[in-house]
Amino acid sequence: MSGRWSVRPRSAGRRGRPWLVLRGRDREAVLWNGPVLELHRRALARVGPDVLADPPDLDRMVANVRREPAGRELGEALLDQRLVAGIGNTWRCEALWQARLSPWRPLGETADAELRAALEAAAALMRGSLAGRRSRNAVYRRAGRACPRCGATIRSRGQGDANRIAYWCPGCQV
């Protein structure tokens, strides 16, 4: 990628003409001398609410997930960016472990409070990582090792059409 990024307080003045500015509440990321930039608004319209929004729209996220078939697996739904934007494979596995939920559980057998707990865990884990407080993974890429909570052997296998590898503890994630 060409160009140079800087992150600064929003109140800081800028000299020159930036190529791209991404504004947060207190800070902004500025790209100088960037490459060709194309915005695809139609693609953005299909993306669900951002798990890192401040605050995240948990009600809308839960409502989006609830529109899915009851037999769809929770772990697969959390990776669907149309439902909830931002959760990747690592955060899916770790959030479900924190919430004690199996990635294989059907959505129809998952209570709203459980779904919210998984979404809140994902948001907290991701925010912590952005702030430099990333803790050691409990299950992600730890197949065959002992679960740090219950001692059962962590398992892994592909899930969904994309066959993304799910890591989970069969002892404490139900």
Language model feature labels by segment:
Residues M1-V174:
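Structured catalytic/nucleic-acid-binding cores of DNA maintenance enzymes
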